[in-house]
Amino acid sequence: MKKRALVSVSDKTGVVEFVKGLLEQGIEVISTGGTKKLLEENGLQVIGISEVTGFPEIMDGRVKTLHPNIHGGLLAVRDNETHVAQMNELGIEPIDFVIVNLYPFKETIAKPDVTFADAIENIDIGGPTMIRSAAKNHKFVSVIVDPVDYDVVLAELEENGEVKEETKRKLAAKVFRHTAAYDALISNYLTEQMGEESPETLTVTFEKKQDLRYGENPHQKATFYKAPFAATSSVAYAEQLHGKELSYNNINDADAALSIVKEFTEPAVVAVKHMNPCGVGVGTDIHEAYTRAYEADPVSIFGGIIAANREIDKSTAEKLHEIFLEIIIAPSFSKEALEVLQNKKNLRLLTVNIEKSTSASKKLTSVQGGLLVQEEDTLSLDESTISIPTKREPSEQEWKDLKLAWKVVKHVKSNAIVLAKDDMTIGVGAGQMNRVGSAKIAITQAGEKAQGSALASDAFFPMPDTLEEAAKAGITAIIQPGGSIRDEDSIKVADTYGIAMVFTGVRHFKH
C-alpha cells in the first residue's frame, strides 16, 4: 500500500523542499489550508484534507482534521487484526507521516498590542491532537514538529526506504516535549491574565540555549536554558562578540554582575567573583567608573567578570586589557575597543541591553524534592519611608556613599556588609554566619580607607557589636533596615560616636 503523509505547518521553513523529497520517495501527501496552497504554488501535487475526510473545513478552519478518517489512520495498530479489519470496513487508510507545527501562540502573545481574543484564537486544537495521536503510535507513524529534523528523515528514507525505529522514538519524545511546552505557555498566559499568583500547579517551560562543558565542577553535567519571555536585559539574551564559550560559572557570575550594574543610572562598573561583587565604582564616565571599581579591590578582580552600563571606549579597553578577566559585559564596545580586547583570544565579550526591570519577575530556586518561587528583589531605596533615629543626620557626601552601599549590599550573600566611600566600594563582607564577622572582613579589606566611610547592612543589627567595630574603624554613617528589639542599643552606640544612622524598613537577605 502506498504510504501517506499529512502536512500542515505554521512554520513553513523548508517544507516545500521536504515535501518534494517525500513525493520523490513515492509518498502521497495530504495537506490543509495555507500549507496546501503554498505547496501547490510550488508545483507540488497534494491531496486536500476534505478529500480524505469527506467533510469540508468549517468554522474558519477550527475543524478540519478532527475526524475519524484522520485519527483512525494515525492511531490504528497495523499488526492488530481487529484494527486492520475496522479500517477496511470503514474505508480508513493509514497515515504514515505527520508533519505539523502549531499555531504561533508564543509569537502572538509576545506582541505588545495583542488582545485576549487574538491569543485565544491562536490556541491550536487540531494540531496537538494529531501529533499526539501520531506520537502515541510512533511504532508505525513518523511525526515531525521541527524543521531541523526534515533532513534526518529524508536521509533515512533515501537510505533505507523507511525511518529507523530509534528515530521514530526520538521524534515522538520531541512531540510530547513540544506539546507540553505549548500547553505550559497557554496555561501561564491564562493564569497571568486571571491574576493568579500561586496556582495549585505550576508548569514552566524553557528553551535550550546551549550545552555547557560541565557544571559548577568538572564532574557535574550542565545545560543552559532560557525562558521564552525573559527580559532582553539578561545573560540568556546577550550576544557574544568574542572569546571562548561561556561556562556554567561564567553565566552565574555574569548574571550577578548584570543585576548589580542595573542598579545605577550614572556610569558604573561592577567586578564580580563567585557571584559576589568585589568592586563597584561610579563616575562621570565609564573610564573613571572602571578605575574606581579596580581600585576597590585590585587583588580579587583578577579573573573576574566586569559589567558596565555604558559603551566600552578605547581608553577603558586598554586598562581592561592590562589584567586577566573572564568576561566583559556592556551595552556596546567601540570599534577601537574591540580591536584592543580581541587580542585576548579567550576573553569573552558580551553585549546586552542594560535596563532595570520595573516589575518583579519570578525567581525559581530548586530544593530537594521541590521548588521555591518568589518575586525577584527589585525594590529600590524609598527616601520617603526612611527614618533617622540618631542625633546626627548624614551629610551630603555620606548620603551619596550610603546610597551606593545600599544598592550593592542587596546583591551580596548574607550576612552582608558593604563599605563605600567617594563613589566606590572599599570593603565587602559576604556570607558569614554572624553579622559582625562580615563587618570585620569588610573593615579589614578597607583598611585606612574605612575612616570616614559609609556602611550598609542587608539586615538589622541583633546586637550593637557591629556598631562598635564600625566606630573603631572610623565609619561615620550607617544604613540598615532596623527592626531589632535591640535597636535602641545600636542607636545609643551610634550617638556616642557621632555616627549618623538611617533605617530603611526594608531587609535584603540573599542566599
From Swiss-Prot:
GO terms for molecular function: IMP cyclohydrolase activity; phosphoribosylaminoimidazolecarboxamide formyltransferase activity. Keywords: Hydrolase, Multifunctional enzyme, Purine biosynthesis, Transferase. Pfam families: AICARFT_IMPCHas, MGS. Its EC number is 2.1.2.3, 3.5.4.10. PROSITE patterns: MGS. GO terms for biological process: 'de novo' IMP biosynthetic process. Residues 1-145 form the MGS-like domain. One of its GO terms (cellular component) is cytosol. InterPro entries: AICAR_Tfase_dup_dom_sf (IPR024051), Cytidine_deaminase-like (IPR016193), MGS-like_dom (IPR011607), MGS-like_dom_sf (IPR036914), PurH-like (IPR002695). Belongs to the PurH family. The IMP cyclohydrolase activity resides in the N-terminal region. PANTHER family: BIFUNCTIONAL PURINE BIOSYNTHESIS PROTEIN ATIC, BIFUNCTIONAL PURINE BIOSYNTHESIS PROTEIN PURH. This is Bifunctional purine biosynthesis protein PurH. It comes from Bacillus cereus (strain ATCC 10987 / NRS 248).
